[in-house]
Amino acid sequence: TKMKLNLRFLKLMLLLFILPLQMLAAELGEAGKLLAALPGVSDVETLKSTHFPEKYVFFIKQQLDAKDASKGSFEQRVILCHRGFDRPTVLVTEGYNAKYALREGYIEELSKLFDTNIITVEYRYFDKSMPSPCNWDYLTVENSLYDLHHVNQTLHAMYKGKWIATGISKGGQTTMFYRAYFPNDVDISVPYVAPLNKGVEDGRHEKFLQEEVSTKENRQKVLNFQLLLFRRKAALLPMFEKYCSEKQYRFNAPIAEIFDYSVFEYAFAFWQWGEDIRKIPTNDATDDQ
């Protein structure tokens, strides 16, 4: 009869709905199942890892305005590398997107040293953590710190050991600000290369690069190389353009300006990354070198 057909159809639809959920649950390990059951957590997906027995990417619901829930919410992307429930946890505080943490071989320095879990939190308004519609009024440091606090409070249900916050560059700044706003959230804070800027134009960097970093002799070697690049610009620019084309780099300015900018920025980049001063080409080097 019509009623029996409706019941059969309903059972079929329920079966089609439940089976994918069962298949998903079967793919999740112990940590993944606990993660998926946490409030506000959604779209838990298994990732491959060469360093961790379980790894997942998921989303967590965050308020746009940390102090006013009526303003709406968005989904923030988080990557979890699970080592063990009895292990410490490293909370990586980003300043930009976090897609690098999706890589199969991803591991963080402090996690290597202390054999920890890793929770990498993508910064709001970047990549997959972009609110829709996009209202830039809510892209504030304070709101980003409440994002971290919410992730911390939610995942503390799984990881009750020591917590370490860490980040690099703008992520390192986030680590410092997070400690200032929520001093009891983590046990240790380890910012890497994190500037504490006095303003948009700070003024201290130029003096440091010109007068203080390394030795006078080494600073002169860097400057001499920059001047050499400008003297040979006519010969080097076609090579530079070819290199950028092969790497599929795209710029919003003429390639000659990009060349100049790269030369001007060389001193900052050189001292930032700590290259071997002996490898810098001198006046007798060929254009290819």
Cite the ranges covered by each PLM segment.
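Catalytic-loop region of hydrolases
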Residues: A25-T116
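Alpha/beta-hydrolase active-site loop signature
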Residues: N97, R124-D127, L196
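Conserved alpha/beta-hydrolase
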Residues: S111-K128
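Alpha/beta-hydrolase active-site loop
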Residues: Y138-H156
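Alpha/beta-hydrolase fold nucleophile elbow
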Residues: Y159-S169
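Glycine-rich nucleophile elbow surrounding the catalytic serine of serine-hydrolase chemistry
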Residues: G167-F177
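Alpha/beta-hydrolase
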Residues: F177-Q289
